[in-house]
Amino acid sequence: MATQWEVVIGLETHAQLSTVSKIFSGAATQFGAAPNTQACPVDLALPGVLPVMNKGAVERAIQFGLAIDATIAPRSIFARKNYFYPDLPKGYQISQYEIPVVQGGQITIQVPANEKAGKEAYEKTINLTRAHLEEDAGKSLHEDFAGMTGIDLNRAGTPLLEIVTEPEMRSAAEAVAYAKALHGLVVWLGICDGNMQEGSFRCDANVSVRPVGQKEFGTRAEIKNLNSFRFLEEAIQYEVRRQIELIEDGGTVVQETRLYDPDKRETRSMRSKEDAHDYRYFPDPDLMPLVIDASWVERVKGELPELPAAMQKRFVDQYGLTPYDAGVVTAGKAMAAYYEAVVAKVGAAQAKVAANWLMGEVSSQLNREGLDIADSPVSAAQLALVLQRIADGTISNKIAKEIFLAIWEEKATDEAAADRIIEAKGLKQISDTGALEAIIDEVLAANQKSVEEFRAGKEKAFNALIGQAMKATKGKANPQQVNELLKKKLG
């Protein structure tokens, strides 16, 4: 069934810009304040007040545009988007329509492998349509008011950058990969804190399906306010199934706005989807056109950090990482800095090993305890010493994991923690040939059946003998030497 249909996805992402004050007023943007304590006369739309543009919001938009190789409009216009909602006091939202500040651009994503579907990891470039500045609306509160709705206008006027893609994603996996790449970029640039639980980064997914080979797009449904990557994936997967089943049963997909219910793992209809003309956009007469001269753009460009895409390419070229691995270790600025600090200690020859540890043991522990890399109990220098001891043959990879966990659990602060633990627990790898030969002779004598099976051509028996040798040394034998000595003795 699925092979008859092509999925078409476009994302609209609202990134809350990290300014101290709102986009058109001096009110604070701090999250979690008591309701309506951060709403000034401009936010409340009181008579006689006028909006004043926040320069910091514009600079953050320029940063983003430069980072995605977009065109920064030298002149852009703010428009009024007219609609009624209780948490929109003015009766319109100040946004950009015909001439946005950021035009075009692209983001390259790394889509992970899907073993169940038999798909390998691949790279894809997603083109962006635009990114425009706008103000956020307030918030409706339903829980604390029996039979009524409360309105909190603290969020009204908070600066947003709405980032719109072309409809070029063809699966939920691609949409999630794009959302993660975008999230990583805005956090990397420092223009958004990326806190999805607080609503700083939220996605609307436009989803449609069409028969394979058809050029015309199908009717789309927009799924609003998805504030986690898991919800984004689940919502798209459900919506794709819903639309395909509806069409195959003889029904018609309706253009509408839908909400995702994470408890039921399904989307439900919210309202009919509006078109642009329904909002009666027109230029805001209270705001002059936004003029950005070339010198301003050049100054911002000179202040940009090394971007994730450039760093990924450097890691591939300099350290021999795969594009996917380079993408993982540059998922955040702190992660990339940690990785480079490890490599600086162990040397470029161990760069791939360092990446594997960062994506494996380190990430596993961080995820298990809900920590960011910046809060890792094991420092880059401590991990580097663990990797050095593997490289110089002092410990095996298995023992290294034990030492890593010991450093993690005791929250050791000494850089030489690995050496201290190796010495205290007697974990040095046995590499003495004479000692290993004696152990292997004992293993062979005690496991004659496995010896006979190996000589009869059963390779699994050889692995069993290696396992017995490692068991006899409590995992401290040098695995490579054990392998070589066993082969020698078995002829």
From Swiss-Prot:
One of its GO terms (molecular function) is glutaminyl-tRNA synthase (glutamine-hydrolyzing) activity. Keywords: ATP-binding, Ligase, Nucleotide-binding, Protein biosynthesis. InterPro entries: Asn/Gln-tRNA_amidoTrfase_suB/E, Asn/Gln-tRNA_Trfase_suB/E_cat, Asn/Gln_amidotransferase, Asn/Gln_tRNA_amidoTrase-B-like, GatB, GatB_C_1, GatB_Yqey_C_2, Gln-tRNA_amidoTrfase_suB_CS. GO terms for biological process: glutaminyl-tRNAGln biosynthesis via transamidation; translation. Its EC number is 6.3.5.-. It catalyses: L-glutamyl-tRNA(Gln) + L-glutamine + ATP + H2O = L-glutaminyl-tRNA(Gln) + L-glutamate + ADP + phosphate + H(+); L-aspartyl-tRNA(Asn) + L-glutamine + ATP + H2O = L-asparaginyl-tRNA(Asn) + L-glutamate + ADP + phosphate + 2 H(+). The keyword Cytoplasm does not apply. Gene3D superfamilies: 1.10.10.410, GatB domain, N-terminal subdomain. It holds the Pfam family GatB_N. SUPFAM superfamilies: GatB/YqeY motif, Glutamine synthetase/guanido kinase. It comes from the Bacteria. Allows the formation of correctly charged Asn-tRNA(Asn) or Gln-tRNA(Gln) through the transamidation of misacylated Asp-tRNA(Asn) or Glu-tRNA(Gln) in organisms which lack either or both of asparaginyl-tRNA or glutaminyl-tRNA synthetases. The reaction takes place in the presence of glutamine and ATP through an activated phospho-Asp-tRNA(Asn) or phospho-Glu-tRNA(Gln). Belongs to the GatB/GatE family. GatB subfamily. NCBIfam families: gatB (TIGR00133), PRK05477.1-2 (NF004012), PRK05477.1-4 (NF004014), PRK05477.1-5 (NF004015). Heterotrimer of A, B and C subunits. HAMAP family: GatB. This is Aspartyl/glutamyl-tRNA(Asn/Gln) amidotransferase subunit B.
